[in-house]
Amino acid sequence: MEKNLTTGSVFGNIVRFSLPYLFSYFLQTLYGMADLFIIGQYADASGTTAVSVGSQVMHMLTLMIVGLAMGATVTIGQAVGARDQKSAARYTGNTMSLFLVLSVAVTGLLLALVRPIAAVMSTPAEAVSGTVAYLRICFLGVPLITEYNIIASVFRGLGDSKRPMYFIAVACAVNIALDYLFIGALHMGPAGAALGTTLAQAVSVAVSLAVMRSARGGIALTRDDFRPQRAIMGRILRIGVPIALQDGLIQIAFLFITVIANRRGLTDAAAVGIVEKIISFLFLVPSSMLSTVSALGAQCIGAGKSRRALQTLWYAIAVAFGFGVLISVVIQFVAEPVVALFTHDAAVVAAGGPYLRGYILDCCFAGVHFCFSGYFCAIGRSELSFVHNITAVVLVRVPGAYLTSRYFPATLLPMGLATAAGSLLSVIICVIAFLVLRRHGKLLPGEG
């Protein structure tokens, strides 16, 4: 189960680690789309809206859990790189204990706030009951979502990105089968979609726990490893909390941008919604690079091979930026046909094309700052990732979207460029932070 990523070809390790991670992200996207697709076949518009709104809430929550789990990936990765099995076991056990308590507490809070959450999301009156039913069941499954992501973070910290891919594949297959049972055969509507999702997570967690217990070459856990230790939990949270807050606030920012688009009318709102889905799919590559740099970089830092960690960063930036440039050039010629894959409305296609042409440049800049974020996490400075992302959101993304929407009512192109400009600011901040760290000798704590 444990894989040493501190030797061999740096580029080869990046490819071998990132491809399963990339496919995992793809499966998670498919997982989320399955509920909407299937309920759209069997329910009315209110049922589809309920699942759509509920899915947005759960997506935001899941991203925050994944961000928080980054602390486990990095700390375990550093321990593995240092060949310190005892520390790796303690970080693993404390992570599981910490997140078990947090998930139960969060579940209780969310269940108490389910109706206010539906109201904050501006859920249409016809879909409120379905949204509440969907969220209640999904909230009961929060401990399962947390458990899956923690187990996945442990495996990735050990250098294994394949097994988490298998676990999400199991969940995806079970979810689709249960959706057809609960929504199609039993006509349970949004509640059926939520029940299918929750039970699929339960199956995935059961499989992942069985694999973790039987896998050879993994971490041997004892009862003492699960005993809370303030220093260990503090280090996990110091890395994970900034990422979780960052991901949550970014999702809130995107909700603001959605509101801004909605005020432009139905056509522009539909165009923005479609382009957001296209971009989220294309961003799978930068996202996989972030996770790859954090996991591989953490092992290299733990092994005292800081120069190799830097090589991992540069190779990942080359891959992510190269992908961004390629896809940006292609989209300039095929923007409208790509948007047309999701709608037959000519007006929506005409509005979405320019927006996609501007927004796609974000793939270039985001690919760079995602890699820097992964590196900052690997060296235990995740607060830098938080700072550059939130600064870009507050100073450029949201105000830029508002101002361009107001002063350019005839086209969405400037609104798309404003989003890319936010990522450009993030790149500038990342480069400055990197140079400052290098000047103060904070990038090379060890040599190898």
Give residue ranges: language-model regions.
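Short alpha-helical transmembrane segments in multi-pass integral membrane proteins
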Residues: 1-18, 76-141, 185-241, 297-362, ...
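Residue-level signal for short hydrophobic patches within transmembrane helices
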Residues: 7, 11-30, 34, 57-64, ...
